């Protein structure tokens, strides 16, 4: 996203849930070991406050990556389900903003039916499909998305549970983020309430972005799974592939050996 924002592309983010129940330092962490937790309006008020904190952290993180438009749908993350309402709402956003590319979670991540990432991906896929047609409640014309990329972290990560046995998915696109890795770290450091800053951010960047980078022949990368096959007039070969083909073993290793300074 930082690369696209830097070259002048319009970049925006949609956050489906308020996120107050998951990973939050106050709601899901400090209350975990209590004998009793607040209920009713008291808990709802706390969750509203915490979701506001999270939203501000997300805005700050996105600003570091170079874009400002962040849309919060505020869905309750207690039991995230695909509904007619959230599909129509997201489809309306797609018709309004007319994206060429959509990034989203893999619709079959984890068990694919209780995993909130998977449900978010399913909502997105239905919305993309519906956005290509008219809606009596939406004056914007239909819009067709050109390409969808699923986050590789969840869909093509290390298998470690029963549902991963389905597998078979692999990252077919790697994006070199070495030049903006410090900015990604700074963005993750903003997500304090989520527990993503500090030591976790540095570990995550090395183990995830570092692994994707090495697979792609660079120091740090992000992996994606593309939805549609690409059509070309000529057989494609990237500049990265040509450079690797003309590099010695040690030059290839040097290409992915840079390590961010951890403070």
Where are these regions (language model features)?
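Active-site rim/loop-helix segments in enzyme catalytic domains that contact anionic ligands
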Residues: 1-97
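Metal-dependent de-N-acetylase/amidase catalytic core
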Residues: 3, 76, 80-263
